[in-house]
Amino acid sequence: MTQSPIFLTPVFKEKIWGGTALRDRFGYSIPSESTGECWAISAHPKGPSTVANGPYKGKTLIELWEEHREVFGGVEGDRFPLLTKLLDVKEDTSIKVHPDDYYAGENEEGELGKTECWYIIDCKENAEIIYGHTARSKTELVTMINSGDWEGLLRRIKIKPGDFYYVPSGTLHALCKGALVLETQQNSDATYRVYDYDRLDSNGSPRELHFAKAVNAATVPHVDGYIDESTESRKGITIKTFVQGEYFSVYKWDINGEAEMAQDESFLICSVIEGSGLLKYEDKTCPLKKGDHFILPAQMPDFTIKGTCTLIVSHI
């Protein structure tokens, strides 16, 4: 049983739309000049992160979940529930839909559904996202996709650093070029591409689309994901609540000074996206820097964070 923060070593994924921002911004060693994703806190079979410190050093997060459920407050479930990513969107990502739990369970061999959310760490001027569509029925959705009426179909939204978007399963969506994003999502890789700008993969073939599944899984008409943001300030910290939903709750902690904290959840997932500081508990001190990702376990004692830094924090 551990009462210490559990730091994770990320896994990186090359993507046709990726770049070098994960290296340039966070100092990571990335596999190529087209690195799109950092699976920062992951217990997904396609890319589990590894414990970097303490008594469980060297174990994957999958192994830790399976062998030491007490670390996570005894939370039930076959699969660790969440996945935290950093996304370097140098070029447009594909337009896609993710299924809900029921559809994924029926069609994706045990995958969870995929509700997700985005925190915009940084973006270029006039950057945007695709969030939803204008179709009023599935018949109209099919017609507009088949005719390539993307301008008429897609809802485009301008974004800026600090924005937050909740993306429920069934939402037609895409991140567009020029964005650096922290994504919190259900622990799933179920994705149905609708359109990919006719790009070719590394073998020179068009990337696979999943038209029928995407239409089946899509929410029609579009419904915006509901968020109810609030802000609380006290000595040393400002906490912004972005969403408290069925699958996860997500917050931003802005530390400026020294903040006293308590860990009251089954576990907390933490990512340092800016600045540096010290996490102190009992007689121990852990340095924190931009690009660190860690879990605060169920048995974590009260602690303080001292410094100037920003964290995105989530729990189930």
From Swiss-Prot:
Binding site for Zn(2+): 98, 116, 173
Active site: 193
Catalytic function, reaction form: D-mannose 6-phosphate = D-fructose 6-phosphate
Keywords: Carbohydrate metabolism, Isomerase, Metal-binding, Zinc
Annotated GO MF terms: mannose-6-phosphate isomerase activity; zinc ion binding
Protein's UniProt keywords contain Metal-binding: yes
Enzyme class: isomerase
Taxonomic superkingdom: Bacteria
The record's free-text note on cofactor binding: Binds 1 zinc ion per subunit.
Cofactor(s) annotated in UniProt: Zn(2+)
InterPro entries: Carb_Metab_Reg_Kinase/Isom, Man6P_Isoase-1, Man6P_isomerase_Firm_short, MPI_cupin_dom, PMI_typeI_cat, RmlC-like_jellyroll, RmlC_Cupin_sf
EC numbers: 5.3.1.8
Gene Ontology biological process terms in this record: carbohydrate metabolic process
Pfam family, one: MPI_cupin_dom
Family membership noted in the UniProt record: Belongs to the mannose-6-phosphate isomerase type 1 family.
Name under which the protein is recorded: Putative mannose-6-phosphate isomerase YvyI
Native source species: Bacillus subtilis (strain 168)
